[in-house]
């Protein structure tokens, strides 16, 4: 029967095989199960094997080994955590980071693993060596960190917000001025005057945008929101800036969702100057003007496909046409990306409008219901109808001298309403001659006979 060491060796080799292009969690869980059988001895054995695998020149072997380290540290108890956070193992990881032979992808994965384990071990002071290595990485190799630390949410005063906005606008203005100057120096003397005029226009443009500030930013990293008011996004997403909420947090909109995001995760997008917009428009018009030539070239190639391309290659007109059409291919690709992005933006804007309209209509419905008039009910003093149709009821009334008298009244007479503007008067002003609303003891006079 094979020993535990032999089983662990086979399991580790399978989980860290260089032929694997992704982590095989079935193999990784198998290693964890073997370590749990004997944590004291198996922890040391498996870490020695992982150290040897990390010494390989194969990047895939090293990446699979790092994934195995994280799984073992999170699932195999305190003994293995001590092995992972020992000075010996953290020293091996530091040597890999300093080595020039290790691929950059592996170094970034090491920094990611150290960050994850440091967060997992921070509640145990005996495992602080991993936290020390994480601090060293942030200080010495900040470029290896895929995601920066989120800044704290500190309120910003009105004066600070004004000063920061002015400083930002000055930086943008200086950047535009330097860009315009570099274009003027590269252009010849024939277009120097036109460049100067464009430069003056470029100086006026930032002054008009000062009140609006930065309108859009591009995400530098992925961000998965941990709180309800935060905005999730992916690297490369363009976020529309709405307002500044905290010192280092802004509120923005992306794909119809609104939330706050940290500034160190994004970079501002400067709006194109009038000269750049005009140049892009000219390029687009030039690409679209070649549409007919592309159709002609395609037709020639289809006709020549049955005869052979050897004769077509000797045709000067075909060669000239091909050389004219080929250079527009990268511009076509760029335009496809541009309009695809604009399409996504318009779809997102449409969704925002639909949500806003739905919310607005819901608020109107609530307001209408809160101010609706209740249904008019019969006066509480109206007598109930107890007589059958045609039955003559005897009603007794008290007169002014204290005597009682009876009147025989049919149902038609009992509920007859006088025609003299009865319905146009409020109940308090209606005539007291309406017999159906008389009660004994209310009026001193008996009702009249109709």
Curated annotation (Swiss-Prot):
Predominant place of localization: membrane
InterPro entries tied to this protein: ENTH_VHS, SH3-like_dom_sf, SH3_domain, STAM, UIM_dom, VHS_dom
Low complexity bias locations: 197-209, 394-432
Keyword Membrane: yes
GO molecular function: phosphatidylinositol binding; protein domain specific binding; protein heterodimerization activity; ubiquitin binding
Keyword Cell wall biogenesis/degradation on entry: no
Keywords on record: Endosome, Membrane, Protein transport, SH3 domain, Transport
Positions of region (Disordered): 141-167, 179-212, 374-450
Biased composition, class Polar residues, residue ranges: 184-196
Domain UIM: 163-182
Residues covered by the SH3 domain: 212-271
Residue span(s) of domain VHS: 15-145
Domain of life: Eukaryota
Pfam families registered for this protein in UniProt: SH3_1, UIM, VHS
Protein function: Component of the ESCRT-0 complex which is the sorting receptor for ubiquitinated cargo proteins at the multivesicular body (MVB).
Subunit annotation: Component of the ESCRT-0 complex composed of HSE1 and VPS27.
UniProt similarity note: Belongs to the STAM family.
Protein name: Class E vacuolar protein-sorting machinery protein HSE1
UniProt source species: Candida glabrata (strain ATCC 2001 / BCRC 20586 / JCM 3761 / NBRC 0622 / NRRL Y-65 / CBS 138) (Yeast)
């Amino acid at each position: 029967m094979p020993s535990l060491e032999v089983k662990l060796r086979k399991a580790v080799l399978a989980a860290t095989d260089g032929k694997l292009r992704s982590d095989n969690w079935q193999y990784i869980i198998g290693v964890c199960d073997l370590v749990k059988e004997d944590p004291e001895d198996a922890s040391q054995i498996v870490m020695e094997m992982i150290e040897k695998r990390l010494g390989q020149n194969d990047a895939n072997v090293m990446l699979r080994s790092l994934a195995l380290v994280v799984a073992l540290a999170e699932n195999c108890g305190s003994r293995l955590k001590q092995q992972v956070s020992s000075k010996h193992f953290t020293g091996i990881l530091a040597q890999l980071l300093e080595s020039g032979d290790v691929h950059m992808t592996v170094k970034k994965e090491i920094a990611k693993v150290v960050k994850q384990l440091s967060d997992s071990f921070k509640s145990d002071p005996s495992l602080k060596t991993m936290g020390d290595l994480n601090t060293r990485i942030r200080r010495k190799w900040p470029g290896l960190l895929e995601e920066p630390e989120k800044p704290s949410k500190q309120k910003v005063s009105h004066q600070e917000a004004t000063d920061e906005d002015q400083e930002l606008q000055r930086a943008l203005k200086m950047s535009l001025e330097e860009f315009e100057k570099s274009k003027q120096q590269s252009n010849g003397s024939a277009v120097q005057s036109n460049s100067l005029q464009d430069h003056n226009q470029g100086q006026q443009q930032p002054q008009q945008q000062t009140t609006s500030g930065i309108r859009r930013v591009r995400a530098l990293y992925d961000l998965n929101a941990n709180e309800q008011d935060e905005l999730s996004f992916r690297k490369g997403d363009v976020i529309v800036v709405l307002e500044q909420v905290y010192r280092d947090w802004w509120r923005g909109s992306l794909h119809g969702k609104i939330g706050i995001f940290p500034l160190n995760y994004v970079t501002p997008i400067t709006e194109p100057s009038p000269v750049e917009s005009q140049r892009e428009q000219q390029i687009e018009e030039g690409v679209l003007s070649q549409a007919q030539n592309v159709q002609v070239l395609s037709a020639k190639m289809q006709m020549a496909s049955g005869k052979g391309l050897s004769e077509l290659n000797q045709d000067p007109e075909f060669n000239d046409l091909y050389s004219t059409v080929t250079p527009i291919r990268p511009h076509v690709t760029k335009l496809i990306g541009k309009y695809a992005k604009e399409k996504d933006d318009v779809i997102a804007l449409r969704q925002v409008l639909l949500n806003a309209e739905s919310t607005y209509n819901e608020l109107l419905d609530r307001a209408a219901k809160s101010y609706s008039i209740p249904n008019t009910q019969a006066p509480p003093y109206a007598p109930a109808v107890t007589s059958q149709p045609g039955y003559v009821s005897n009603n007794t009334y008290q007169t002014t001298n204290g005597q009682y008298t009876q009147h025989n009244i049919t149902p038609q007479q009992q509920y007859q309403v006088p025609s003299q503007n009865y319905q146009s008067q409020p109940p308090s002003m209606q005539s007291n001659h309406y017999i159906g609303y008389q009660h004994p003891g209310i009026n001193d006079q008996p009702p009249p006979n109709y």
